[in-house]
Amino acid sequence: MTDSTNNQGTSGRPDDDHTTEEVASVFNDPGAQAPAGEPDPFVVLENLQLENAGLKDKVLRTYADMENLRRRSEKEVADAKLYGVTSFARDMLTFADNLHRAIESLPAEAKQAVDGPLKTFVEGIELTERDFLSRLAKYGVKKIEPLGNKFDPNLHEALFEIPDESVVSGTVKQVVEDGYVIGERVLRPAKVGVSRGGPKA
């Protein structure tokens, strides 16, 4: 009686075998239901993957926004450095104009004829103009050189037309007042006279 009882106990207990089969079936069959009260591991995994994808997308978007902000900030700083002197430079153009008028008021023949202190004075004015324009260029301010070029309404202001059939119509023939740019912006357009009557461009 004792042997039979022991044999029955060691041969296997129905409850234990049933539990092992249930656990195995859950892991071997993806469609199998998880034990009552516990979340399905495949559903949990799928939810985690979706959450991970969402977080990754947010990180990428945040990184892109930060890169755009960095580029925009760098451009604003560069523009501030370049264009921060715009008002001051525009005021200084009057000084440049006066220097140029002083030099132009003396005809070329008279310049060659002068001697002594007067010659030194004229050369001093010319040197001052060159030095002043050089200093403006250091801050991005450059003179527009329109003479002989095609009229550009973005850079030039036409005051009058000059009949001339020897050049292409619309060519800048005379500069009344120098124009200047700062960086890529027009500080002041050049006031010019434009040819007409010649061949079309």
UniProtKB/Swiss-Prot annotation:
PANTHER family: GRPE PROTEIN, GRPE PROTEIN HOMOLOG, MITOCHONDRIAL
Main location: cytoplasm
Gene Ontology terms, MF aspect: adenyl-nucleotide exchange factor activity; protein homodimerization activity; protein-folding chaperone binding; unfolded protein binding
Superkingdom to which the source organism belongs: Bacteria
Name of this protein: Protein GrpE
GO biological process: protein folding
Biased composition (Polar residues): 1-11
Keyword Cytoplasm: yes
Cellular component terms (Gene Ontology): cytoplasm
Function: Participates actively in the response to hyperosmotic and heat shock by preventing the aggregation of stress-denatured proteins, in association with DnaK and GrpE. It is the nucleotide exchange factor for DnaK and may function as a thermosensor. Unfolded proteins bind initially to DnaJ; upon interaction with the DnaJ-bound protein, DnaK hydrolyzes its bound ATP, resulting in the formation of a stable complex. GrpE releases ADP from DnaK; ATP binding to DnaK triggers the release of the substrate protein, thus completing the reaction cycle.
Subunit structure: Homodimer.
Cellular compartment(s): Cytoplasm
Keywords, alphabetical: Chaperone, Cytoplasm, Stress response
Positions of region (Disordered): 1-40
Family assignment from sequence similarity: Belongs to the GrpE family.
Coiled coil (UniProt feature): none
InterPro entries hit by this protein: GrpE, GrpE_coiled_coil, GrpE_head
